[in-house]
Amino acid sequence: MATIKEIKEQLAAISDLLDPHWTEFEADARSGVQAAVRQRKKIIQADLDEEVRLENMLRYEKDLYLQGYQAIAGIDEVGRGPLAGPVVAACVILPKNCKIRHLNDSKKIPKKKHEEIYKQVVKVALAIGIGRISSEMIDQVNIYEATKMAMLQAIDDLQGLVSRPDYLLIDAMNLGISIPQSSIIKGDAHSLSIAAASIVAKVTRDRMMIGYDEIYPGYGFAQNVGYGTKQHLEGLETLGVTPIHRRTFEPIKSMLKEKN
């Protein structure tokens, strides 16, 4: 009789829930074998579910491929809501029908997985561009216009095997340029190209905020990335406003008025 270790090795070779060998393993009454069978089936089902999810997230891209477009760029931004730091956008062109496991809207990816998936995107992407708009410029033009500026900058910054996209998939934004484009609500959850841009923008901005935390300690920028957490608000009260704070955002706007 095969040991449980040997059976686990045999189960690892099965990748189909309809494989006829399941019957043999399911007939083994040992609890360890039954646990191994359940675990392996769970893994296979998770893989199948992930494949379906990735296929669904490629539906916009596949439709565009059929129309003749090749260099399809996903565009997304992070940093609209924080009280400090830049708004950062990324433009990413992935290879045709490229699938990256667990790539999703960056807000849905566990933080500990951000760097890993970011590296996978960077490794396979045909081209990546980054746009960064400072808090000073955000105050001058407003966050909506600053977001558009960051996205346009990301397109112009494209570096890699492709220098110019022939179609843009954008997360909930219309850019007034001649390149054909689609604005997709919650695009980072529905398009793999936009999801790739989302994680690139997120990791890029997080790294910037970690750097700012060293320059301006006491606000917790490495942890809150500029959002208005308790530590951040307490830092504003005790240390004041830094050059990277957005002066048109509350409560900073009111704090500056009171001082004047």
Swiss-Prot record:
Where does the sequence pass through the membrane?
A: none
Name of the top EC class for this enzyme:
hydrolase
Cofactor(s) for this protein?
Answer: Mn(2+); Mg(2+)
Localization, per the record, is: Cytoplasm
What region holds the RNase H type-2 domain? 70-260
Q: What is its EC number?
A: 3.1.26.4
Looking up Gene3D superfamilies in the UniProt record yields: Ribonuclease H-like superfamily/Ribonuclease H
On the tree of life, the source organism's domain of life is Bacteria
Q: Which PROSITE patterns match?
A: RNASE_H_2
What protein is this chain from?
A: Ribonuclease HII
Q: Which gene encodes it?
A: rnhB
